[in-house]
């Protein structure tokens, strides 16, 4: 059979404290139709072998719109906070008045204000719970609470007060934090700001990761400066908020090179694809982005995306090379080789200048041994990097290094300062490795380093047949190069050590040297040789 008792129990599910007598009349007013003994037991009521909490009885009474007299009794059985919360939920102003009449000193109940949906009751309740006696303090407290709990009509009613006391910005910040979308829109259009900070709503949207807040900010009838939109785009890139970035890009249609550079640096490939679809960035901007991607150690996919967007003939800018070296990004080198204008020699030179051994080693895979050693030794000499020079010469065949350095010295002929450095470096290397003196003499003769040539001759064993042959070769070199001092010194040195039999052969060599000088029309050298030959004939006759 249908049981009113069971039906009533379905509505009883909360809990209270403090009990008083219940009567049959009271229960009938509440809609509970039981007969039998009623026993009070602390926080519960015992009716006909059934237990009911005081809180559940109060809640049921409010739900059934019970008489105020009954409710006046029931609110005394429970804690004031619970009674107030239930009264707010059911929008019972009379019950709230009753509760406060019994509890003149109450703690702050701001945290339960939001339980009511009535503006009038919200304001009425605030009158009781606000402790301040100052009117302005009470008003600001009410407006902060109204903003916190999304009571727009209260704010609208007090708009003039908000403007007059310049609290619009502070209230707006609360609305943003609580994500009250409609309230935010009202603030932005109601003209209540003292000085509106355009970034407040955007910053809050990013801080909370709330896309709906960003949409509100974009749709507000406000003209934002471009620098703010760019800044927000950069924030979206940093946080990897693709939806945020897309919304800003499509809504405001603002583009700057810094956007693509940041996207490359933070390895945001989806954002890069979105930007490339706009077809507005030139090759130079993409190269700058590539440099940023290298700096940020972006993935190979991101690097390939940037490289594939470049014109194959576009000259690679220095910042790309410097980024590879500075940030030691070895992985990008094979990818950049696909660019026709990428110069591994340039990269190697910068790596040597910055003493980046890792990049230098990585370049080995893309250069022949001769080319690698030529570039490394040349830059090591020019930059006076003794450590690098020793690193690449200690384990290698000394004669191979000597030959490579000869080529370097010849190529530096138009750079006398650097050539002098290379000559000195070669001389020290030759001395350290104790190589045959003949090879050094010929290099010094070829480049007309007379002082170093003389020093080398002093250190040489002039009676050694190989040294004599080297000096004769130096004669020929000097004749061809028009190095008169070298020729004269070699001539005099050989006369001192040659036997009579050797002098006859030497005379023929001098005559041949004159022919070499005449081929290039070195008149000064020809006159010098003629004068030497004239005196030499007398020596032979003797």
Curated annotation (Swiss-Prot):
Keyword Transferase recorded: no
Pfam families, sorted: DUF249
Keyword list, A-Z: Early protein
Induction field: Expressed in the early phase of the viral replicative cycle.
Keyword Metal-binding: no
Purpose of the protein: Plays a role in virus cell tropism, and may be required for efficient virus replication in macrophages.
Family label: Belongs to the asfivirus MGF 505 family.
Name of this protein: Protein MGF 505-11L
């Amino acid at each position: 059979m249908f049981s009113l008792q069971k039906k009533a129990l379905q509505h009883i599910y909360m809990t209270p404290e403090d009990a008083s007598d219940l009567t049959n009349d009271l229960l009938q007013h509440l809609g509970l139709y039981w007969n039998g003994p009623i026993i009070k037991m602390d926080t519960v009521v015992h009716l006909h072998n059934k237990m009911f909490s005081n809180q559940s009885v109060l809640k049921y009474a409010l739900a059934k719109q019970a008489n105020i007299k009954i409710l006046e009794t029931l609110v005394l059985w429970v804690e004031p906070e619970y009674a107030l919360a239930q009264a707010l939920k059911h929008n019972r102003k009379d019950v709230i008045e009753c509760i406060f009449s019994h509890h003149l000193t109450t703690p702050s109940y701001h945290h339960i204000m939001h339980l009511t949906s009535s503006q009038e009751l919200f304001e009425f309740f605030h009158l009781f719970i606000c402790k301040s006696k100052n009117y302005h303090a009470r008003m600001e407290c009410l407006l902060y609470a109204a903003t916190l709990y999304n009571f727009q009509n209260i704010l609208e009613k007090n708009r003039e007060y908000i403007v007059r006391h310049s609290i619009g910005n502070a209230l707006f910040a609360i609305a943003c934090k609580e994500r009250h979308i409609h309230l935010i829109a009202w603030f932005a259009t109601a003209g209540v700001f003292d000085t509106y900070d355009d970034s407040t709503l955007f910053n809050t949207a990013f801080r909370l990761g709330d896309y709906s807040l960003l949409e509100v900010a974009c749709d507000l009838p406000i003209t934002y400066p471009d620098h703010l939109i760019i800044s927000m785009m950069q924030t979206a890139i940093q946080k990897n908020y693709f939806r945020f970035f897309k919304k800003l890009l499509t809504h405001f249609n603002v583009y700057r090179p810094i956007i693509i550079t940041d996207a490359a640096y933070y390895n945001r490939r989806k954002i890069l694809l979105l930007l490339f679809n706009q077809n507005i960035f030139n090759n130079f901007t993409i190269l700058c982005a590539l440099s940023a991607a290298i700096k940020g150690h972006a993935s190979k996919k991101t690097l390939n995306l940037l490289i594939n967007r470049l014109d194959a003939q576009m000259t690679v800018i220095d910042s790309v090379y410097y980024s590879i070296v500075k940030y030691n990004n070895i992985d990008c080198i094979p990818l950049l080789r696909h660019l026709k204008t990428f110069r591994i020699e340039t990269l190697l030179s910068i790596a040597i200048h910055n003493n980046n051994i890792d990049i230098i080693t990585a370049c080995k895979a893309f250069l022949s041994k001769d080319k690698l050693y030529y570039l490394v030794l040349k830059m090591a000499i020019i930059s006076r990097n003794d450590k690098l020079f020793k690193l690449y010469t200690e384990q290698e065949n000394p004669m191979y290094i000597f030959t490579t350095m000869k080529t370097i010295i010849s190529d530096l002929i138009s750079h006398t300062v650097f050539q002098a450095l290379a000559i000195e470096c070669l001389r020290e290397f030759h001395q350290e490795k104790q190589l045959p003196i003949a090879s050094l003499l010929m290099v010094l003769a070829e480049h007309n380093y007379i002082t170093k040539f003389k020093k080398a001759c002093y250190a040489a064993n002039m009676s050694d047949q190989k040294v004599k042959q080297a000096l004769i070769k130096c004669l020929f070199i000097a004749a061809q190069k028009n190095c008169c001092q070298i020729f004269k010194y070699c001539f005099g040195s050989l006369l001192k050590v040659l036997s009579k039999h050797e002098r006859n052969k030497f005379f023929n060599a001098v005559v041949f040297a004159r022919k070499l000088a005449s081929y290039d029309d070195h008149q000064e050298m020809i006159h010098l040789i003629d004068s030497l030959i004239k005196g030499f004939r007398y020596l032979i006759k003797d």
